[in-house]
Amino acid sequence: MSKHKKLNVAVIGATGYTGLDLVLMLSKHPYVKINSLCATKNLGKKISFFDKRIKKKLPKVTSINKIKWDNLDLIFLSLPNGEAQKLIKKKFYKNKKLKFIDLSADFRIINPKIYKKNYNINHKAIKLIKYSLYSVPEL
C-alpha cells in the first residue's frame, strides 16, 4: 500500500449549508487533514454542533484571523457572493502557492460586466480571474 501525503485544508464558511456538506465529505476523505474551520459566528463550537452527521474529531470553529496560512495546501471558500474575491485578492499575492476552491459565484463568470449585471456587485479581483477555473464538481 502506498503512502500519500495528506492535503492540509481549511474551510472558510464552514457552518453554512454548503460548508457543512463540504466538511462532512472532507472529514471522510483519507488524504485530507482539516486544519481550520472558519466562520463569523459561533466561534469555539464543535462543528458537530451544526451537523450531527460529522463524527470525526475536527478543530473547533474559529475566525479567519486565526488561520495559519503557511500550514495549508488548499483553502475551500463557502462564502456569500462578493466575499471570496476579497479574501482571495488579499491572500493570493502574499502566498501564490496557495490554492483556493471557491464555491460561490465570484469566479464563475469571467466577464466582470456580466458578473456585475447578474449579481449587482463590482468584481474586486478582476486580475485574478485569469488564474481561476470554474467547474461543477458535483460535490
Model-derived features: positions:
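N-terminal Rossmann-like NAD(P) cofactor-binding subdomain of oxidoreductases
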Residues: 1-139
